[in-house]
Amino acid sequence: MTIADNKKAFFDYFIEERYEAGIVLEGWEVKAIRAGRVQIKEGYVVVRDAEMFLIGAHISPLQSASTHINPDPVRTRKLLLKADEIKKLIGKVEQRGYTLVPLNLHYTRGRVKCEIGLAKGKKQFDKRETEKNRDWDREKARIMKGGVKE
């Protein structure tokens, strides 16, 4: 079940490969995610010392969050991947033009997982072409349905 999607990533990048990673979360973050108070549009993934971290994802704390902790909505969260997957991704990210972006948050067997994508940035004309194709697909669907009036 999907919790949050990053639609902006599909508009700004060509997604070449996808990986599923676990996330190290605190208790208040899990409760807030279950309540749907998460936004990953501004998030990105970095590699530090052969470990991966999700930066910029915003998890808004609930009002009922504990009083003895100070919740940080945009803290850096560690991503959990297998060592060989991390090595493979490090090699590909070091190539020019590749980056790692979070695509969505979802549940797998009751655990919150983050799907990350190996992505290459789109140029402005690529974005315009994507928009034209999307509009044409909508228009085709409308024509096939018989809803065009001239």
From Swiss-Prot:
Its main location: cytoplasm. Keywords: Cytoplasm, RNA-binding. The keyword RNA-binding applies. GO terms for molecular function: RNA binding. InterPro entries: SmpB, SsrA-bd_prot, SsrA-bd_prot_CS. HAMAP family: SmpB. Required for rescue of stalled ribosomes mediated by trans-translation. Binds to transfer-messenger RNA (tmRNA), required for stable association of tmRNA with ribosomes. tmRNA and SmpB together mimic tRNA shape, replacing the anticodon stem-loop with SmpB. tmRNA is encoded by the ssrA gene; the 2 termini fold to resemble tRNA(Ala) and it encodes a 'tag peptide', a short internal open reading frame. During trans-translation Ala-aminoacylated tmRNA acts like a tRNA, entering the A-site of stalled ribosomes, displacing the stalled mRNA. This is SsrA-binding protein. It comes from Cupriavidus metallidurans (strain ATCC 43123 / DSM 2839 / NBRC 102507 / CH34).
